UniProtKB/Swiss-Prot annotation:
Its EC number(s): 2.7.4.14, 2.7.4.6
Protein name as annotated: UMP-CMP kinase
Localisation: Nucleus; Cytoplasm
Underlying gene: CMPK1
Keyword Transferase: yes
Annotated organism of origin: Homo sapiens
Co-factor(s): Mg(2+)
Region (LID), start-end ranges: 133-143
Free-text domain note: Consists of three domains, a large central CORE domain and two small peripheral domains, NMPbind and LID, which undergo movements during catalysis. The LID domain closes over the site of phosphoryl transfer upon ATP binding. Assembling and dissambling the active center during each catalytic cycle provides an effective means to prevent ATP hydrolysis.
Catalytic activity: CMP + ATP = CDP + ADP; dCMP + ATP = dCDP + ADP; UMP + ATP = UDP + ADP; a 2'-deoxyribonucleoside 5'-diphosphate + ATP = a 2'-deoxyribonucleoside 5'-triphosphate + ADP
Pfam families membership: ADK (PF00406)
Disulfide bonds: none
Length: 196
């Protein structure tokens, strides 16, 4: 069985993580956050990638695609090796740019199927406010206004064109993420009930 993938995209603070947790609970997907995998790998003293990842994340730059894809692939392989039925994955925060997408197509072509892109559309100011709130408790070094403005710029320049590309293929499910968590999840449920 091939992994079935839903790419989850949206700016920082659009609520991707929160919604993914609910999708996992209700639909039995496995949630893979590209950012979290990179942050965990960065903390792993045995990692061959640790220092490199640290440097990129600190500078708010996008980590080389080979690293991200190898971490995603490793997780998918391990999950499916443990339980062959668990072949549905939410990949959150990836692909971030053209380079990511090309890397994915090159490495994963024929090895995984992308069902659709779940796009959480959210006003920048709302996203910033949410992240600043989260920064008080998350301990994430990149949840401060300056870093956020940079992340939103990167997102708009790099990720938005990817969403547009999938839009042309009719593969984007767009959700208004500025609403409350429950209202947003209602929209998510409508999509997953239809798409599986």
């Amino acid at each position: 069985m091939k992994p079935l993938v839903v790419f989850v995209l949206g700016g920082p603070g659009a609520g991707k993580g929160t919604q993914c947790a609910r999708i996992v609970e209700k639909y039995g997907y496995t949630h893979l956050s590209a950012g979290e995998l990179l942050r965990d790998e960065r903390k792993n003293p045995d990692s061959q990638y640790g220092e490199l990842i640290e440097k990129y994340i600190k500078e708010g730059k996008i980590v080389p695609v080979e690293i991200t894809i190898s971490l995603l692939k490793r997780e998918m392989d391990q999950t499916m090796a443990a339980n062959a039925q668990k072949n549905k994955f939410l990949i959150d925060g990836f692909p971030r740019n053209q380079d990511n997408l090309q890397g994915w197509n090159k490495t994963m072509d024929g090895k995984a199927d992308v069902s659709f892109v779940l796009f959480f559309d959210c006003n920048n100011e709302i996203c910033i406010e949410r992240c600043l709130e989260r920064g008080k408790s998350s301990g994430r070094s990149d949840d401060n206004r300056e870093s956020l403005e940079k992340r939103i710029q990167t997102y708009l320049q790099s990720t938005k064109p990817i969403i547009d590309l999938y839009e042309e293929m009719g593969k984007v499910k767009k959700i208004d993420a500025s609403k409350s968590v429950d209202e947003v999840f209602d929209e998510v449920v409508q999509i997953f009930d239809k798409e599986g």
